[in-house]
């Protein structure tokens, strides 16, 4: 399922949202083993997994500890950075070849100022 298709299961996509999707989102192909967000960095991107599988993990005392898996149609972000404005506690890695759409959280915040639909959706 594409990101716009997923959105239409929850909301009606109007012109403002369509413009956001066309100008503020980017789709990337990620190879298995690629880290798209590193622990201890500031990453304010929101990701949607169109295809593949991602995981979040951290290192502690030399051990790699998986905290979550994100299959297709999942939305994820480093909430530490977005909401607490601190470096991420977790890394995000593709554990299969994946197709991922991302956008900056700040751009979604701007859209929320003019789109009640997105403002309400983002609070779910």
Regions found by a protein language model. Name each.
Residues 25, 43, 64-65, 87:
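Short coil/loop residues immediately preceding or within conserved phosphate-binding loops
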Residues 33, 44, 48-55, 72-74:
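Glycine- and acidic-residue-biased ligand/ion/polar-headgroup-sensing regions
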Residues 36-41:
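Short phosphate-coordinating micro-motif centered on Lys-Gly-acidic
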């Amino acid at each position: 399922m594409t990101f716009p298709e997923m959105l239409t299961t929850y909301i009606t996509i109007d012109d403002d949202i369509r413009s956001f999707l066309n100008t503020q989102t980017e789709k990337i192909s990620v190879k298995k083993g690629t880290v798209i967000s590193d622990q201890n960095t500031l990453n304010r991107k929101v990701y949607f997994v169109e295809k593949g599988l991602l995981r979040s993990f951290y290192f502690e005392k030399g051990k790699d500890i998986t905290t979550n898996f994100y299959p297709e149609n999942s939305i994820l972000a480093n909430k530490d950075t977005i909401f607490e404005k601190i470096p991420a506690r977790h890394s995000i890695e593709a554990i299969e070849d994946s197709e991922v759409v991302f956008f900056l959280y700040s751009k979604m915040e701007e859209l929320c100022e003019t789109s009640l639909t997105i403002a309400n959706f983002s609070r779910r």
